[in-house]
């Protein structure tokens, strides 16, 4: 009989274990199902963030690459134009001119020096004329000519009538009023007896 109890107990344990196993599996499955439903949201959010970050990094890196590439292309273009471009044409023309001059009896070195001297002379004359023009303009301003010269040269009643339309009359009138106001202020200042107490009282 004990063996019968033993077999019955063993059978009961197996049945109970088989019942508990599916229950645990269903609980685990339901937990994992709930977690798996929540995780895809987190995973998709993380995936989107990683994707956006990687896209931003890619875009940034690609922009840097394009900038570097453009700079390299520009430098290459400059080097190519320097080698075979406009400067090359100018240098060939210069060489041809110097060869012609040397074949006509002028020394090559002398022709180069003469061209340099001509350019230098032209540059010096231009600088001198610019300086003279600036000096004349400043002298013209200092002497207070300008609009008055125009009026003296014009001399007709129509030209004088145009002063207001040109705005010079208004400007001259404002200047006259400013001069009168300055003179009145100076007269008042001279005639006033200002003491140190008055000055300190104003600024306190």
Curated annotation (Swiss-Prot):
Pfam families referenced in this protein's UniProt entry, alphabetically: Hormone_2
Site feature location: Cleavage: 52-53, 83-84, 115-116, 148-149, 163-164
The name this protein goes by in its record: Pro-glucagon
Listed GO CC annotations: extracellular space
SMART domains documented for this protein: GLUCA
Keyword DNA-binding part of the UniProt annotation: no
Organism: Heloderma suspectum
Subcellular location, record wording: Secreted
Lineage: Eukaryota, Metazoa, Chordata, Craniata, Vertebrata
Family membership noted in the UniProt record: Belongs to the glucagon family.
GO function terms (MF aspect): glucagon receptor binding; hormone activity
Residues recorded as bearing Arginine amide in the entry: 145
């Amino acid at each position: 009989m004990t063996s019968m109890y033993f077999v019955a107990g063993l059978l009961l344990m197996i049945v109970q274990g088989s019942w508990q196993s599916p229950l645990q599996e269903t609980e685990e499955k339901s937990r994992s199902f709930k977690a798996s439903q929540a995780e895809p949201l987190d995973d998709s959010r993380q995936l989107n963030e990683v994707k956006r970050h990687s896209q931003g990094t890619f875009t940034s890196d690609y922009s840097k690459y394009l900038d570097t590439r453009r700079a390299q292309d520009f430098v290459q273009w400059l080097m190519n134009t320097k080698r075979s471009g406009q400067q090359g044409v100018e240098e060939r023309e210069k060489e041809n001119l110097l060869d012609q001059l040397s074949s006509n009896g002028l020394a090559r070195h002398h022709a180069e020096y003469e061209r340099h001297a001509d350019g230098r002379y032209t540059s010096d004359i231009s600088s001198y004329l610019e300086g003279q023009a600036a000096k004349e303009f400043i002298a013209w301003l200092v002497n207070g000519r300008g609009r008055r010269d125009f009026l003296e040269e014009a001399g007709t009643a129509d030209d004088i009538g145009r002063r207001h339309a040109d705005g010079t009359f208004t400007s001259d009138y404002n200047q006259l009023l400013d001069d009168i106001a300055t003179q009145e202020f100076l007269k008042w200042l001279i005639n006033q007896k200002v003491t140190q107490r008055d000055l300190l009282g104003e600024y306190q």
